[in-house]
Amino acid sequence: MVTMTTQTDYSDISMTVLGAGSYGTSLAISLARNGAKVILWGHEEAHMNRLEADRANEEFLPGVAFPPSLIMSTDLEKSVQASRDLLVVVPSHVFGLVLGNVKPFLRDDSRICWATKGLEPETGRLLKEVAVEALGESHSLAVLSGPTFAKELASGMPTAIAVASPDKEFVKDLQEKIHCSKTFRVYANNDFTGMQLGGAVKNVIAIGAGMSDGIGFGANARTALITRGLAEMTRLGVALGAEAETFMGMAGLGDLVLTCTDNQSRNRRFGLALGQGGDVDSAQEEIGQVVEGYRNTKEVWLLANRMGVEMPIVEQIYQVLYQGKDARVAAQDLLARDKKSES
């Protein structure tokens, strides 16, 4: 078992990162590079043993050595209690489960930030609602979101992201801990709702962009889809009380463009496979990692229907993923819609 032992010095831990996938690991590496002591917790003992033995994540982040101040752990209780600040980086479909497991070990002063992008499965609820239900309202909450690929972040390539929380002191502290003037810029944002929504919707639109390219429609179609996808994202956000300008920032347009245009994106590659004639199961198997956008599509579709917000791109992607519609037919149906005003 990879755990902090009695010999492990876990005083002065700056942050505990919960989730040792590629993105959680890359964030933990970035934090530790700033000179802070950071715990990276994961629940799979074999995986964590391998990370500790290699002092790297050779499967998904090859060639990126762990900083000496990065500590591996599978002990959830010690990991949670060692730091006031927790950064949750797990898939959205297990977000509530992980928080429920964390709750018994929280300190009175614990603050929780998440970099998970998505909504609650089967309900489409924002993750803030899930967090409050799991943890109560006595802990500060924050969301970290923006255009980041794990490999580039871990490699120290220049990256910018945003953080939002109702607790302004928490935002300031997170900026201090995460921001690195050389490679990693962190912007403060006041829109807690919009910051949560952008990361979920962009995953769905990225699948659509991949489908478009897989069919062979070219750059014009991809750009139109991104632009109209941004309009759908903004409409839903405003209906939920978010600020429209948030979606022109890091967690909206920034993340959307990145995910729709680069093949490092699992969601885009998933869509490419579908556009080229693959089915959902074979496309997911081809990716080999969690494709958040698959679940996000149903979640966003549920939320849009509940709010009465028209999202025709999301509707067509939902029909492809969950109702067996052919991607080419979905594209034709989008193009055949009645003439509309752009606004």
Swiss-Prot record:
Catalytic reaction annotation: sn-glycerol 3-phosphate + NAD(+) = dihydroxyacetone phosphate + NADH + H(+); sn-glycerol 3-phosphate + NADP(+) = dihydroxyacetone phosphate + NADPH + H(+)
UniProt xrefs under Gene3D superfamilies: N-(1-d-carboxylethyl)-l-norvaline Dehydrogenase, domain 2 (1.10.1040.10), NAD(P)-binding Rossmann-like Domain (3.40.50.720)
Residues forming the catalytic site: 202 (proton acceptor)
Stretches of the chain forming a coiled coil according to its record: none
GO molecular function: glycerol-3-phosphate dehydrogenase [NAD(P)+] activity; NAD binding
A Pfam family that the UniProt record links to this protein: NAD_Gly3P_dh_N
Species per Swiss-Prot/TrEMBL record: Aliivibrio fischeri (strain ATCC 700601 / ES114)
PROSITE patterns, alphabetized: NAD_G3PDH
Taxonomic path: Bacteria, Pseudomonadati, Pseudomonadota, Gammaproteobacteria, Vibrionales
Gene Ontology CC: one annotated term: cytosol
Positions bound to sn-glycerol 3-phosphate: 117, 146, 148, 202, 255, 265-267
Enzyme class name: oxidoreductase
Protein name: Glycerol-3-phosphate dehydrogenase [NAD(P)+]
Subcellular location: Cytoplasm
InterPro entries: 6-PGluconate_DH-like_C_sf, 6PGD_dom2, G3P_DH_NAD-dep, G3P_DH_NAD-dep_C, G3P_DH_NAD-dep_N, NAD(P)-bd_dom_sf
Main subcellular location: cytoplasm
Annotated residues for binding of NADPH: 22-23, 43, 117, 150, 266, 290, 292
Family, per entry: Belongs to the NAD-dependent glycerol-3-phosphate dehydrogenase family.
Superkingdom classification of source: Bacteria
Purpose of the protein: Catalyzes the reduction of the glycolytic intermediate dihydroxyacetone phosphate (DHAP) to sn-glycerol 3-phosphate (G3P), the key precursor for phospholipid synthesis.
Pathway linked to the protein: Membrane lipid metabolism; glycerophospholipid metabolism
GO biological-process terms attached to the record: carbohydrate metabolic process; glycerol-3-phosphate biosynthetic process; glycerol-3-phosphate catabolic process; glycerophospholipid biosynthetic process
UniProt KW keywords: Cytoplasm, Lipid biosynthesis, Lipid metabolism, NAD, NADP, Nucleotide-binding, Oxidoreductase, Phospholipid biosynthesis, Phospholipid metabolism
EC number: 1.1.1.94
